[in-house]
């Protein structure tokens, strides 16, 4: 039997499809999301409706974004969900979540079992819409969740950690084994909750500068920041900010990266492109 076929649908490798089928895990995720009527609930990648059905049962309306046209068509004709759904058959990576929040008249509650092959770039796309998002619950590769929640001085801590924690409070919810999916992925999975900060704990003047600094630092994470960021900061400037130039990218806190970004935004602002 082909383990890539589930409920008559052949999982497409190019879409990174692995379908959730463990009822205990499904119930645990829905409880964590806790959907309520009247909320602007949005699911990315509903697939074969493992989460869509139990979430949809609690709601009058549900918006879904599904790239796979066959799966989008199945949802349109779903016996009880169909009338409740607004289906966008398009790529979540190019979706304008700000426009949708404006249309729905409230911040969005976004959730989904995300295709692992696009999860990191999709996170960065969603971070640009945190003003329009109330919270997010995602099933991701466990390694990605570890990176999202990691603190300084750990191997998992990287650019994704800094940018996620700049925008959101990041909370791990539960771990999920490969056996909970068809076909089983080759990696462990985990569910994470991301809640955009109501008030930024470390506001930056230009988030593009923060993005640039973290990219340059973590692209050369084995180097000291005296070397990896030497083109942006002198030793004197780093020392003046209370940051040891002998530290590496993984030793610097989110607050310190934001401090560095604000210094650069004031003293060497990026030109508008």
From Swiss-Prot:
Its main location: cytoplasm. It holds the Pfam family RrnaAD. It is an enzyme of class 2 (transferase). GO terms for molecular function: 16S rRNA (adenine(1518)-N(6)/adenine(1519)-N(6))-dimethyltransferase activity; RNA binding. Its EC number is 2.1.1.182. The keyword rRNA processing applies. SMART domains: rADc. It catalyses: adenosine(1518)/adenosine(1519) in 16S rRNA + 4 S-adenosyl-L-methionine = N(6)-dimethyladenosine(1518)/N(6)-dimethyladenosine(1519) in 16S rRNA + 4 S-adenosyl-L-homocysteine + 4 H(+). Belongs to the class I-like SAM-binding methyltransferase superfamily. rRNA adenine N(6)-methyltransferase family. RsmA subfamily. This is Ribosomal RNA small subunit methyltransferase A. It comes from Escherichia coli O139:H28 (strain E24377A / ETEC). The lineage of its organism: Bacteria, Pseudomonadati, Pseudomonadota, Gammaproteobacteria, Enterobacterales.
């Amino acid at each position: 039997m082909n383990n890539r076929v589930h409920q008559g649908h052949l999982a497409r490798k190019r879409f990174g499809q692995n379908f959730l089928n463990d009822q205990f895990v499904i119930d645990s995720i829905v409880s964590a999301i806790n959907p309520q009527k009247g909320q602007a609930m949005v699911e990315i990648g509903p697939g074969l409706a493992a989460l869509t059905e139990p979430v949809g049962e609690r709601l009058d309306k549900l918006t879904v974004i599904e790239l796979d046209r066959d799966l989008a068509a199945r949802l349109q004709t779903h016996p009880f969900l169909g009338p409740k759904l607004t289906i966008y058959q398009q790529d979540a990576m190019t979706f304008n979540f700000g426009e949708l929040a404006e249309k729905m008249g409230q911040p969005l509650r976004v959730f989904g079992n995300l295709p692992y092959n696009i999860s990191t770039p999709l996170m960065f796309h969603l971070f640009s819409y945190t003003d329009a998002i109330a919270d997010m619950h995602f099933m991701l590769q466990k390694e990605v969740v570890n990176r999202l929640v990691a603190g300084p001085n750990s191997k998992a801590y990287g650019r994704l950690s800094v940018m996620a924690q700049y925008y959101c409070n990041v909370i791990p919810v539960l771990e999920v084994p490969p056996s909970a999916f068809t076909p089983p992925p080759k990696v462990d999975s985990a569910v994470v909750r991301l809640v955009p900060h109501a008030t930024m704990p470390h506001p930056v003047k230009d988030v593009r500068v923060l993005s640039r600094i973290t990219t340059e630092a973590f692209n050369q994470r084995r180097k000291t920041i005296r070397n990896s960021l030497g083109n942006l900061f002198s030793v004197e400037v780093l020392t003046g900010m209370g940051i040891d130039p002998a530290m590496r990218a993984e030793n610097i806190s989110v607050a310190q990266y934001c401090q560095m970004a604000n210094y650069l935004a004031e003293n060497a602002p990026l030109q508008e492109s």
